[in-house]
UniProtKB/Swiss-Prot annotation:
Family in the record: Belongs to the hssA/B family.
High-level lineage: Eukaryota, Amoebozoa, Evosea, Eumycetozoa, Dictyostelia
Source organism: Dictyostelium discoideum
Family matches, as PANTHER family: HSSA/B-LIKE PROTEIN 17-RELATED, HSSA_B-LIKE PROTEIN 17-RELATED
Biological process per Gene Ontology, one example term: sorocarp development
UniProt superkingdom: Eukaryota
Protein's name in the database: HssA/B-like protein 14
Length: 89
């Protein structure tokens, strides 16, 4: 019975671990799309915001919050370079 209980416990730990990974991926996607919304409005500047958003999403997925700041700053810079009507929305 003890061996069976141990195997059951190991199975539960794996299940929890998979749930946490899925959770991280979901947060990564959400952070990515939020950062992309901060991109510039036209020209090459929108690419700056998009790249910043993707980098931000990947870093948040690994547990580093700084990635979101990088994506947001790139989006704001792209918005400022494009004109006053652009920026984070």
């Amino acid at each position: 019975m003890t061996l069976l209980a141990s195997i059951s416990t190991i199975g539960n730990v794996k299940s929890i671990s998979k749930s946490n990974n899925f959770s991280s991926l979901s947060n990564s996607s959400l952070q990515s799309s939020n950062s992309i919304q901060c991109g510039g409005c036209g020209g090459g500047n929108s690419l700056i915001g998009t790249v910043g958003g993707l980098v931000g999403g990947v870093l948040v997925g690994t547990g580093i919050i700084v990635g979101t700041v990088i994506g947001t700053v790139n989006g704001v810079v792209g918005g400022l370079l494009s004109g006053p009507s652009c920026g984070c929305h």
